[in-house]
C-alpha cells in the first residue's frame, strides 16, 4: 500500500513538474515588416493570445515575445485589417491584447508601428498584459466611437501596460490622445516621448484609475499635444508619480499642461525632478498645473526639485528643493539621441544641476539615466534630459580624422578638429553631443574628388542603417561667436540622410538626426559637385545642402555664400540653403524614415546664385522641395522666427522658393531680388517668396521690399491650384496678382507698408525691425502669438520675449520692434 501510494505521488509529482515546465516555457514569434512575406503583427498577436499557430505565425505559450524583425528598407509594421465592427478578438481594427505579450523592436527609428484612422492601435483587454519596447507607434483614432479613449493605446481595468524606450505620436481620442489607463492594473511608462497627439481631455495621457493604483511615469517627454477641452499634456483622475520628466509646449482651451481632475486632498499625486513649463491655455496664457478641487480640497502629495511655471489652485503636503526660477531654456523638440525626441537644456537653464543631490529617499532621488539612456550625475538636471558633452572640438585647424570609424575623434597632433569630428561621427554612428567653442573654423582643405569628407565642405552622413547617427554641434554664445568659414570652392556644410538610386527617384533613407546651435556659416562658393548622387541633381546650396534625414538649425546665420553654374555646369539652386525633405513617392516603401528640417531663430542673408555659363538659376536665399501627401509622418520644412533678407538670384526667385509641405511662422522676407540684370518682364517668380503646392501654412509672416527685376514682387504661387494657406496675421506689401492666398485671410494686411528700419544685429542675429508706428507692431493678439501648429512662440529671432504682462500682443515678422540705435559716427550697424 505504501509502495502503491508512493508511486502515485511520484507520478503526480512528475506530472506537476511537466505541467510547470510547460507553463514556464515562453514562445518567441518573429514578426516581419510590411512588404515582406511571413508572419505579420496582427497574426502574431492572435497566435500569442490563443497559444495556437495562426497564418504564418507559430503558436504562443506563456508570456510570448514578438520580435519585430529589422528591415532596413521597410521599417513599418501596420495594424493590418481596418475596423469593420466593434470586436475585441483581434480580427479587425485595433490590436487586442488578451494574454501576456512582449513586443520587442530594434529602436524607435527602425521599428515603426502604424495604427488605423478609425480605431486605436493597441487595446490591452482585462487580464491582458502588454510590454512594448523600443518602437515608434504612429496614429490611431477613436474620436466619435462608443469606447473613444486611448488614441494610440488603451489599458482596460484588470490589465497591465508597460512601455519602455519608445515614441507615441499622432493619436486622437476623447480621453488620452496617446495613452488611456483605467481601473486596476499598473501602468508604467519609462523613457517614452509622447507628442503630436490630441484629445478632448488629456491630449497626451489620461488616467482614471482608483486610489491606490499608482501610474509610474519616469523620464517622459510630453510635448506638442492638444486638448480641445482641458489638459493638453496629462489629465488625471487617479494617482501618478512623475519623475525626471518634461511636460512642455502642450495646449488646451482649458489647462495647457497637467490637470488633477478630482476634488479633494490626495497623497497619491507626486512630482520629483521634473519640469512643467511653457504650456498654454486657449487665451495664450501660461498654464502648467491645475487642480480641480476647491480651496482646502486641492492638496497634492509631494513636489520635490520640480520646476512648475504657472500653478493654479494646487497646494502640496510637502515641498523640497524646488527651483526659484522657471526659466528652463528648452530647445525645440528633437532627436538628441536614442530616436526618442527630447528638449535639450540650453546654456543658462535653471534646470541644469537642479535635481535632488541625495538618494536617501528613492522616490525623490534622480533616476540613474535620462530619457535617452544617458547616465545622470549625482545632482542631476531636472526633466527628461541630462546635459552631457560627449566631445569637445579643441582645434581650429582643418585636419581630417586619422582613422574614421574607430569611435575616437583624432586628427594630426592628437587634436579633435571640426572636420575630424564629423568624419568620425559619420563613420561610427551613435550619439554625439559636441561642444564647439567660440572662434573661427576655417575650412581650407581643397575638395578631394576621391574622398568627399576629406576636403571642401563639412559632410554629415550615415550610409548605414545600423547604429543610427544623432549628431549635435553646440556652438557657444551668440549666433556670431562660433563661425564656420569656407575658403575653398565648395559649400560650407552638407547633411545627407538619403541617397537616390536611379531615374525613378527610388530613395534609400538612413536614420540620421543632425542639429546645429549658435553658429554663423559663410564663405561657401559652389561651382562643382562631383558627389551629387540624386538623379537630375544640380548645384545645390552655397551655404548648406540638406538631403533627407531629420535636421534642426537653431540660432544660426547663413550669409555671404554663392552658387555659380559655370560651363559645362548645370542648373544652380539656393545661394544660401537648399533643403530636400522628400521621403517617398509612388514606387517605394510606405512611410520610410520621414525627412524633416526645422530652422528656428535664424537668418539667411546676402547670399547669391549666378549663372555665368548661361544656365538656369533659382533662389538666392532658400530653395526647399518638400514631401508630398504620400509622406504620412513628415513635417517637411518648417521655419520659425527667421529673416531671409538681401539675397539675390541672377534669374529666378530672390528670397525663397518653397515647394511641397512647408510652414513659416514669424518670418520676415525682406529686400531680396531676382533677375536684376535682366530687362523688365524677363525674370520669373517672385523676388520675395515663391510657393508651390497646397500643403503649406503661413502665420504671422512679413514680406516686403522685394524686387523681380525692377518691379516690386513679394509673393507668387507658381503651380496650378497652389496657394499660401493663411492662418492669420500675415503682412505682404506687394502681393501682386499671382499670389493666391487661401485659409483665414480676415486678419491679413495686404498692400501695406510695414515701415521697416535698416538691418540691425543683436546677439549676432541680423534682422529688420518694424518702426514704432508700423502696422506690424502689436498686430497679433496674445491668443494668436503661435506657430502654425497653434503652440505659443515665447521668443523672437534675437531671443527677446515675444510678449510681456504689460504688452501681451505680438508683432508680425521675425522680431519684436526695437528702437534703432544711434551711433556718434552716424553709421548704422
Which functions belong to the PLM regions below?
Residues 127-218, 225-226, 488, 499-632, ...:
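Right-handed parallel beta-helix
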Residues 18, 22-149, 155, 266-518, ...:
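N-terminal, post-signal-peptide segments of secreted/periplasmic proteins
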Residues 28, 111, 131, 136, ...:
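Ser/Thr-centric signal marking residues that sit
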Amino acid at each position: 500500500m505504501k509502495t502503491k501510494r508512493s508511486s502515485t505521488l511520484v507520478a503526480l509529482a512528475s506530472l506537476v513538474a511537466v505541467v510547470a515546465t510547460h507553463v514556464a516555457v515562453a514562445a518567441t514569434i518573429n514578426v516581419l515588416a510590411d512588404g515582406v512575406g511571413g508572419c505579420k503583427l496582427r497574426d502574431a498577436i492572435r497566435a500569442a493570445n490563443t497559444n495556437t499557430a495562426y497564418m504564418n505565425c507559430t503558436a504562443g505559450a506563456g508570456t510570448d515575445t514578438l520580435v519585430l524583425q529589422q528591415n532596413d528598407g521597410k521599417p513599418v509594421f501596420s495594424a493590418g485589417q481596418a475596423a469593420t465592427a466593434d470586436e475585441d478578438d483581434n480580427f479587425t481594427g485595433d490590436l487586442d491584447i488578451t494574454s501576456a505579450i512582449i513586443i520587442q523592436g530594434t529602436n524607435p527609428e527602425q521599428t515603426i508601428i502604424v495604427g488605423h484612422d478609425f480605431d486605436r492601435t493597441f487595446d490591452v483587454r482585462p487580464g491582458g498584459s502588454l510590454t512594448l519596447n523600443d518602437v515608434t507607434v504612429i496614429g490611431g483614432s477613436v474620436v466619435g466611437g462608443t469606447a473613444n479613449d486611448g488614441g494610440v493605446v488603451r489599458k482596460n481595468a484588470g490589465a497591465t501596460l508597460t512601455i519602455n524606450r519608445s515614441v507615441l505620436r499622432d493619436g486622437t481620442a476623447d480621453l488620452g490622445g496617446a495613452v488611456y489607463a483605467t481601473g486596476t492594473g499598473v501602468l508604467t511608462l519609462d523613457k517614452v516621448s509622447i507628442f503630436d497627439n490630441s484629445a478632448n481631455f488629456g491630449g497626451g495621457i489620461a488616467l482614471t484609475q482608483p486610489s491606490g493604483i499608482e501610474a509610474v511615469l519616469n523620464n517622459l517627454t510630453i510635448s506638442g499635444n492638444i486638448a480641445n477641452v482641458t489638459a493638453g499634456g496629462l489629465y488625471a483622475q487617479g494617482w501618478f508619480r512623475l519623475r525626471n520628466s518634461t511636460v512642455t509646449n502642450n495646449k488646451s482651451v482649458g489647462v495647457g499642461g497637467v490637470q488633477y481632475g478630482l476634488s479633494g486632498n490626495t497623497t497619491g499625486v507626486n512630482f520629483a525632478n521634473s519640469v512643467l513649463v511653457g504650456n498654454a491655455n486657449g487665451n495664450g496664457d501660461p498654464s502648467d498645473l491645475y487642480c480641480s478641487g476647491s480651496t482646502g480640497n486641492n492638496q497634492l502629495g509631494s513636489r520635490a526639485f520640480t520646476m512648475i511655471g504657472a500653478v493654479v489652485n494646487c497646494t502640496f503636503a510637502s515641498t523640497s528643493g524646488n527651483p526659484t526660477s522657471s526659466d528652463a531654456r528648452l530647445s525645440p523638440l528633437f532627436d538628441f539621441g536614442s530616436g526618442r525626441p527630447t528638449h535639450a537644456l540650453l546654456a543658462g537653464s535653471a534646470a541644469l544641476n537642479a535635481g535632488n543631490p541625495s538618494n536617501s529617499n528613492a522616490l525623490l532621488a534622480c533616476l540613474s539615466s535620462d530619457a535617452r539612456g544617458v547616465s545622470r550625475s549625482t545632482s542631476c538636471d531636472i526633466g527628461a534630459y541630462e546635459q552631457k558633452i560627449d566631445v569637445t572640438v579643441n582645434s581650429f585647424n582643418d585636419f581630417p580624422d586619422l582613422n574614421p570609424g574607430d569611435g575616437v575623434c583624432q586628427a594630426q597632433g592628437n587634436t579633435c578638429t571640426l572636420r575630424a569630428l564629423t568624419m568620425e561621427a559619420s563613420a561610427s554612428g551613435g550619439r554625439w553631443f559636441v561642444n564647439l567653442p567660440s572662434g573661427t573654423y576655417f575650412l581650407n582643405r581643397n575638395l578631394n574628388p576621391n574622398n568627399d569628407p576629406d576636403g571642401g565642405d563639412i559632410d554629415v552622413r550615415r550610409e548605414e542603417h545600423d547604429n543610427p547617427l544623432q549628431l549635435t554641434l553646440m556652438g557657444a554664445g551668440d549666433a556670431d561667436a562660433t563661425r564656420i568659414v569656407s575658403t575653398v570652392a565648395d559649400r560650407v556644410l552638407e547633411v545627407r540622410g538619403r541617397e537616390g538610386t536611379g531615374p525613378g527617384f527610388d530613395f534609400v533613407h538612413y536614420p540620421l538626426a543632425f542639429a546645429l546651435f549658435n553658429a554663423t556659416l559663410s564663405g561657401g562658393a559652389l561651382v562643382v559637385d562631383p558627389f551629387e548622387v540624386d538623379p537630375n541633381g544640380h548645384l545645390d546650396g552655397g551655404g548648406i545642402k540638406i538631403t533627407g534625414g531629420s535636421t534642426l538649425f537653431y540660432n544660426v546665420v547663413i550669409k555671404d555664400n554663392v552658387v555659380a553654374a559655370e560651363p559645362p555646369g548645370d542648373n544652380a539652386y539656393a545661394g544660401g540653403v537648399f533643403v530636400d525633405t522628400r521621403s517617398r513617392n509612388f514606387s517605394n516603401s510606405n512611410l520610410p524614415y520621414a525627412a524633416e528640417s526645422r530652422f528656428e531663430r535664424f537668418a539667411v542673408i546676402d547670399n547669391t546664385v549666378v549663372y555665368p555659363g548661361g544656365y538656369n538659376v533659382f533662389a538666392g536665399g532658400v530653395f526647399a522641395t518638400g514631401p508630398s501627401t504620400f509622406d504620412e509622418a513628415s513635417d517637411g520644412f518648417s521655419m520659425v522666427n527667421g529673416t531671409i533678407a538681401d539675397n539675390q538670384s541672377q534669374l529666378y526667385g530672390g528670397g525663397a522658393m518653397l515647394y511641397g509641405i512647408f510652414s513659416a511662422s514669424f518670418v520676415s522676407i525682406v529686400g531680396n531680388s531676382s533677375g536684376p540684370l535682366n530687362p523688365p518682364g524677363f525674370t520669373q517668380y517672385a523676388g520675395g517668396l515663391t510657393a508651390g503646392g497646397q500643403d503649406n501654412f503661413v502665420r504671422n509672416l512679413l514680406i516686403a521690399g522685394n524686387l523681380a527685376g525692377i518691379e516690386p514682387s513679394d509673393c507668387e504661387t507658381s503651380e496650378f491650384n497652389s496657394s499660401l494657406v493663411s492662418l492669420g496675421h500675415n503682412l505682404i506689401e506687394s502681393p501682386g496678382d499671382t499670389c493666391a492666398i487661401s485659409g483665414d485671410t480676415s486678419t491679413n494686411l495686404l498692400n501695406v507698408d510695414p515701415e521697416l528700419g535698416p538691418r540691425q544685429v543683436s546677439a549676432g542675429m541680423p534682422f529688420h525691425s518694424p518702426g514704432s508706428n508700423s502696422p506690424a507692431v502689436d498686430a497679433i493678439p496674445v491668443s494668436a502669438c503661435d506657430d502654425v501648429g497653434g503652440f505659443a512662440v515665447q521668443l523672437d529671432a534675437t531671443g527677446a520675449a515675444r510678449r510681456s504682462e504689460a504688452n501681451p500682443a505680438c508683432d508680425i515678422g521675425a522680431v519684436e520692434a526695437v528702437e534703432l540705435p544711434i551711433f556718434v559716427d552716424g553709421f548704422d550697424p
